[in-house]
């Protein structure tokens, strides 16, 4: 499909109070432009439990009312794909999307270029040794809002940090 309309908010954890407003504006836009909603996609996480519950509840309500399917999107895989397609890296690099989980923790995973799990999805405490066993042998491309705080901690020669890769909620 093609994104017809979207909103972005980078003002911290305010999505719970804005989600309903954004959905109404998008539904009004769709009605006014004659755009048919064929499905609703929602993040399956990982992420804030409360945020995911709110998003899934809103999405399920929309699907029920519109009689359309609900599509679950794994956020870390989406970030890895976005990083792959926006940047050119050699074939043998690994991709490590990260979602900030407060303090020095991130939700993360490591994927190869076919999106096979190299390190499973989980919550990880970041220190100078995080992923060092992989970094000793392969280049890893770190992306997502959680990678920003890791840049000053993971100082390995094979660590590549890409900025500006964030999931888009539409």
Cite the ranges covered by each PLM segment:
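Surface "functional belts" at beta-alpha junctions
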Residues: 2, 69-168
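N-terminal beta-alpha supersecondary unit
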Residues: 1-46
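DPxDG-like acidic metal-binding loop motif
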Residues: 41-75
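Short glycine-aspartate micro-motif
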Residues: 37-43, 51, 94-98
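Stable alpha-helical structural segments in soluble proteins, enriched in small hydrophobic residues
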Residues: 26-30, 65, 83, 169-170
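Buried hydrophobic packing segments
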Residues: 23, 58-62, 79-83
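Residues at secondary-structure transition points
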Residues: 10-18, 49-53, 57, 74, ...
